[in-house]
Amino acid sequence: MEMKKRLMLELRNRKAADVKELVLDNCRSDDGKIIGLTSEFENLEFLSMINVNLLSVANLPKLPKLKKLELSDNRISGGLEVLAERTPNLTHLNLSGNKIKEINTLEPLKKLPHLMSLDLFNCEVTMLNNYRESVFELLPQLTFLDGFDADDQEAPDSDPEAEDLEENGEDGEDDEEDEEEFEDELDDEEDDEEGEDEEGEEEEEGDEEDEDDEDVPQGEKRKRDLEDDGDEEDDDDEEDDE
């Protein structure tokens, strides 16, 4: 499903300003860019765009209340200064499975004073010598890197903010049902359009037949009608004989 269509699904009967949690996982971005998401989502606190083939976050709008951003399994290699400019209150950032190769790529994140948790699993940068020490030194505001703090203590399984968002959000099953209903509606609209086209074609064919009859001389037309009546009478006689 395209990202714009998925946004339409998520917005059904709601205004963008009323949305606090938005999940766009596994939909298709537009040439590796975010599309359809606007600054009207001003109260958004949780945004997930996992596996949407993103190359860049350049089109991310200003989201002043965003706290948690999931961007794992994309192809982002840089441009993180956008996050510092447009998500100033970010606390959790997941960039796992992206194309982050160098520590200095993370430098723009220094401007996110509330950033507590950063995930970089399956990024090449994690293979560098002294990776963890370097990241904690670069980003002193961090508490957890890849699920562990600087003393190798594991992060809690869940954080209260995320739980609150999940409780306030719709259940996964409801989302799936809504998505199926939405797709069915789109299919019905397409079928209606096709049906209208077919009806139009049938009407045109009927009009052409009427025109053909009008073109036939009156004598010929009367002759045809008489022949048709004669055929019907013959059929009736055969039935009586039986």
UniProtKB/Swiss-Prot annotation:
It is found in: Nucleus. InterPro entries: AN32, Leu-rich_rpt, LRR_dom_sf, U2A'_phosphoprotein32A_C. Its main location: nucleus. The keyword Chaperone applies. LRR repeats lie at residues 18-38, 43-64, 65-87, 89-110. The keyword Transcription does not apply. Residues 123-165 form the LRRCT domain. Coiled coil: none annotated. One of its GO terms (cellular component) is nucleus. Histone binding is mediated by the concave surface of the LRR region. PANTHER family: ACIDIC LEUCINE-RICH NUCLEAR PHOSPHOPROTEIN 32, ACIDIC LEUCINE-RICH NUCLEAR PHOSPHOPROTEIN 32 FAMILY MEMBER B. Belongs to the ANP32 family. This is Acidic leucine-rich nuclear phosphoprotein 32 family member B. It comes from Xenopus tropicalis (Western clawed frog). The gene is anp32b.
